[in-house]
Amino acid sequence: GILAFGNVGRNVARIAAGFGMEVYAYDAFCPKEAIEAAGVKAVDCQDALFETCDVVSLHIPATAETKQSINAALVGKMKKGAVLVNTARKEVINEPELLKLMEERADLKYVTDIKPDADADFAKFEGRYFSTPKKMGAQTAEANINAGIAAACQINAFFKDGCTKFKVN
């Protein structure tokens, strides 16, 4: 299951499908038709995603609405033996609630590329918990070169045509 079907979510879905996985997705801002056009099954709400999937991969931004939104009530809906994968932001996870749920459910697994604040507490779930010390998603040589090229192209487009396509504020 893919929570948030932006660029990263779409790529994860494509890779998962390449392994023969049946892929589901939910994105509050992406039309179901766009999800289905990518060969992915759209669900109506995030609860349905967590109830349906053996693995849920998070790709949501950390906003006022999403911070702490991945909580025990939501993760508790996951199937027996399910895996929660967080490659989004650590702020979206309600760590105290997830810790408590993992105490209660010995079948639940959590994988993250962002070391949680409560890493020492999660460490007791050896074999069911894995994290990396820092977010590595975009820290490859190729990604850094591409980011530099993209920034240069955007600056050039602004001065040449007044293009503000990627304006942040």
Regions flagged by a language model, labelled:
Residues 30-123:
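Rossmann-like adenosine-cofactor binding region
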Residues 1-2:
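Hydrophobic Val/Ile/Leu positions in short beta-strands of Rossmann-like dinucleotide-binding domains
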Residues 21-22:
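Residues at the starts of beta-strands that form the adenosine-phosphate
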Residues 13, 17, 102:
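Gly/Ala-rich phosphate-binding loop of Rossmann-like dinucleotide-binding domains
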Residues 25:
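Conserved SAM-binding motif I beta-strand of class I
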Residues 9-10:
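N-terminal Rossmann-fold NAD(P) dinucleotide-binding loop
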Residues 109, 116-169:
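C-terminal helix-to-coil terminal segments
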Residues 5-6:
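Glycine-rich Rossmann-fold phosphate-binding loop(s) that bind the pyrophosphate
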